[in-house]
Amino acid sequence: MFRPYTIEEGAYLVKLARSTVETFLKTGKIIIPESPPQRLLIDNYGVFTTIETVSGDRYELRGCIGYPEGYKNTLYATIYSAIGACCQDPRFPALRIDELPHVIFEVSILSPLTLLQDDPRKYPELIQVGRHGLVVRRGPYAGLLLPQVAVEECWDAEEFLLHVCMKAWLPGDCWLDRRTKLYIYEAQIFREKTPGGEIYERNLVAETAKCSPKTRRENEQ
């Protein structure tokens, strides 16, 4: 299982993402911390920052941007993915400073990508929902879905494959085409419980327990 960081290091990254966004929205400046944990300057993992609006017990995506295969180092990737999530996600308007008390920050640290080279028909058997994220690439098209997306949507492996193909603007069965390259990866995910509050590490395997057959049927309706 891919877990390179302690909860203290993960909390540092989530707090860094929030403080980076707050400073950027207030001043337009990107501040690099003076004395970060040294391993964050050495490691070079992929990083995604996700921002969600909280309304009661509901969460709505507000922005998600990142680097599948790293950017300089984990520290820089966190800083610049946070800026991207708040202000550069083309699906949403830029985050406003007054929204900060109402949004949750989540930072996902990605393992190196692994290319699947088996018979594509076997891919659903190789993908573990709650463990794997997916990347598809074909020519100029590419799409990525974080592992938590499949858990939150209660998808099975085939549904996960369909949606990552659609994310890349490819046919839903693109994964069956040998011209398509399919990659799997794992992620260590740190998240705020409340806006600016306590930070914890998500356990996606445990979260899949809510995806009963009944829940799946309700999601399909």
Curated annotation (Swiss-Prot):
List residues of the AMMECR1 domain.
Answer: 8-201
**HAMAP family under this entry?**
AMMECR1
Extract the InterPro entries matched here: AMMECR1, AMMECR1_dom_sf, AMMECR1_domain, AMMECR1_N, AmmeMemoSam_A, Uncharacterised_MJ0810
Under SUPFAM superfamilies, the record lists: AMMECR1-like
What protein name applies here? Protein Pisl_1005
